[in-house]
UniProtKB/Swiss-Prot annotation:
Entry protein name: Snaclec B9
GO molecular function, one term: toxin activity
Lineage, opening ranks: Eukaryota, Metazoa, Chordata, Craniata, Vertebrata
Residues spanning the signal sequence: 1-24
Disulfide bond entries: 27-38, 55-144, 121-136
InterPro entries associated with the record: C-type_lectin-like, C-type_lectin-like/link_sf, C-type_lectin/snaclec_domain, C-type_lectin_CS, CTDL_fold
Length: 148
């Protein structure tokens, strides 16, 4: 009876240690799983657009990571901290300023536009809380996310 409990406990420990790493999900080698998605940290800095393109080409359905809960963010931050030290990491959120619905404070419609050719993309840090934005053309590490 003691041996049965020991073996059962051992199997439970193995199962729990593998859950959340992609073993229970159908993630490619080197990718980690969480909540029906697979994630991978890439340590070669790229612009936001190049990182998104890289993610799209790396595996079917992959994009820069989108974060939908504090638990998912904690998972990604932990994954990043295992791979990189304090780094700026692109996520899949961006705002192209010249494509927004803008209006003047006096209520007049915006007809004339003279936007600079700059867009802003969102990044996070593995050591600082909160999301920040910066020019998309700047280089940063990134995390890709794909359906499991």
């Amino acid at each position: 009876m003691g041996r049965f409990i020991f073996v059962s406990f051992g199997l439970l420990v193995v199962f729990l240690s593998l859950s959340g790493t992609g073993a229970a999900l159908n993630c490619a080698s080197g990718w980690s799983g969480y909540d029906q998605h697979c994630y991978k940290v890439f340590d070669k800095p790229k612009s936001w657009a190049d990182a998104e393109k890289f993610c799209k080409n790396s595996t079917n359905g992959s994009h820069l990571a989108s974060i939908h809960s504090s638990e998912e963010e904690a998972f990604v931050v932990k994954l990043v901290s295992q791979t990189l030290e304090s780094q700026i990491l692109w996520m899949g959120l961006s705002k192209v300023w010249n494509q927004c619905d803008w209006g003047w404070s006096n209520g007049a419609k915006l007809k004339y536009k003279a936007w600079a050719e700059e867009s802003y993309c969102v990044y996070f840090s593995s050591t600082k809380k909160g999301w920040r934005s910066r020019a998309c053309r700047l280089l940063g590490h990134f995390v890709c996310k794909s359906p499991a």
